[in-house]
Amino acid sequence: FCSGYSSSPSNTNSPQDGPRFPSVTYYDNINAQDKLISEHFGITNPLMYLGFSMGAQQAFHWGALHGEKTGGIIPLCGTAKTTTQNWITLEGCKLALQSDFNYNNGDYSSPPKKGLKAFSRNYTSTLFDKEGYEEGLHLNLFDGFEDTESYLNFMDSFFGSIDANDLLGMLNTWQMGDIGKHEKFNNTKEALANINCPALVMPSSTDLSFPARNNIPEVKGMPNAELKVINTKYGHLAGGMSTTL
């Protein structure tokens, strides 16, 4: 949800349009996915759930709730619970977007371009660590960039193409991420213990958003999980947007 394709602030009619769109959790997303593949496609025992970043967090949630009927999960560069540090980083990115006068508390008549650019510059700073950016690895992404400014302009264009309320909706889902926040479980530890399907957890060794160290206690709390750290200089993007490790 909130991607702009499925139900989102940008395509939902009043009274739940724009900033009035309800908060969506990862469990809301995976339950809708389960309904789609089981009722529409007739898939009741999926072989694998693989996801990167927010998709990795969804993979953990899927495993906690639907692991018994799934062959396995592979979370790439994500955690079962959003850390406080990660939450604060996202809060800063949200505020950067919302500080645009044209944002108008979400009731904008045209895209808040300055706010979207401010978000882009803030968030993009987290994609590589210091060494990755200093070595110019960001210039190797996609078809390559001449310099850092052209890289930033590309990212600005990418994030600028997303509706601001949709983007904020996805960030809200990310911030609320915690597999323990479900009526079936009392806490995160209990939810981790319920991921009975095989799990291959693959963090990036240089990820600033989801450091590999945060997956260590999560994997220890899962009955059938293995941790394989991707040894890379490509930060968060090693899990899904970089063709080079």
Regions inferred by a protein language model and the residue ranges of each:
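Gly/Pro-rich cap/lid or specificity-loop segments adjacent to the active site
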Residues: 1-57, 64, 68-90
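Conserved alpha/beta-hydrolase "acid-adjacent" motif
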Residues: 184, 208-214
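Catalytic histidine-centered segment of alpha/beta-hydrolase-like enzymes
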Residues: 233-244
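Active-site nucleophile elbow and catalytic-triad environment of alpha/beta-hydrolase enzymes
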Residues: 151-154, 169-191
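Alpha/beta-hydrolase-fold enzymes
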Residues: 69-157
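Short glycine-rich catalytic loops that host catalytic nucleophiles or stabilize transition states
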Residues: 205, 228-234
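Short, conserved loop/helix-junction motifs that constitute active-site signature segments
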Residues: 192-196, 220-223
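Short beta-strand/loop motif that positions the catalytic acidic residue
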Residues: 195, 201-203
